[in-house]
A protein has these predicted regions:
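Conserved beta-strand-loop-alpha-helix junction that forms the acyl-donor binding cleft
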Residues: 121-130, 147-152
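A short helix-loop-beta-strand connector motif used in the catalytic cores of GNAT acetyltransferases and
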Residues: 43-54, 84
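Conserved GNAT-fold acetyl-CoA-binding loop/helix
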Residues: 16, 20-45
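A short beta-loop-alpha structural element at the N-terminal edge
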Residues: 3-17
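Conserved acetyl-CoA binding element of GNAT-fold acetyltransferases
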Residues: 76-92
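Conserved beta-strand in the GNAT
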Residues: 54, 60-69, 84, 89
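Conserved acetyl-CoA-binding loop-helix of GNAT-fold acetyltransferases
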Residues: 90, 96-109, 132-136
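Conserved GNAT acetyl-CoA-binding A-motif
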Residues: 104, 111-123
Length: 162
């Protein structure tokens, strides 16, 4: 079972490489992959606006996600009072072991901690493993989000009990 813990500054390199490895399978789907790749490869910068949470197995970071709380600046297609989850990534060799779900659940726990009644994310049908997981967890389609480098994204939200 993975250890879910807070991101530490010395985790930056591992988290950035993990994000690149996790998104590599989609490189042919995004227009201007080099620009998008540069953004993905700087996932650790999300620590400046949110809380990065990592999943670790035997000292190796195998999953990560960023939680951005209510009232913190975020993309205009999210309501300001909604906490959100950004860039849930899991190493390909560790998928199917509940790591993504554990990280998402930790974000939901933090949203409850922060007194939120709704928790949101944006994702794409391209994410053929993540999207069904979110739907099984109770996330519902709310609205379209702007395309990202030619890929359609949508906003999903889940009502949560404090």
């Amino acid at each position: 079972m993975p250890v879910v813990r807070e991101f530490l500054p010395n985790d930056s390199a591992q988290v950035n490489v993990l994000a690149l490895v996790a998104f590599e399978q989609f490189k042919d789907s995004y227009h201007d992959w080099p620009t998008f790749r540069a953004k993905i490869g700087n996932m650790s910068a999300l620590a400046d606006v949110g809380e990065i949470i990592v999943a670790e197995v035997e000292g190796q970071i195998v999953g990560a996600v960023a939680y951005v709380g209510p009232g913190v600046p975020k993309a205009e297609f999210f309501r300001p009072e909604w906490p959100i989850m950004r860039m849930l990534v899991v190493a390909p060799d560790f998928r199917g072991r509940g790591i993504g779900r554990a990280l998402a659940q930790e974000c939901i726990h933090r949203a409850k901690r922060d007194g939120a009644s709704v928790f949101a994310l944006h994702t794409s049908e391209l994410m053929h493993v993540a999207l069904p997981m979110y739907q099984r967890m109770g996330f519902k389609l709310k609205s379209a989000a702007p395309m990202i480098h030619g890929v359609k994204y949508d906003v999903y939200a889940k009502e949560i009990d404090g």
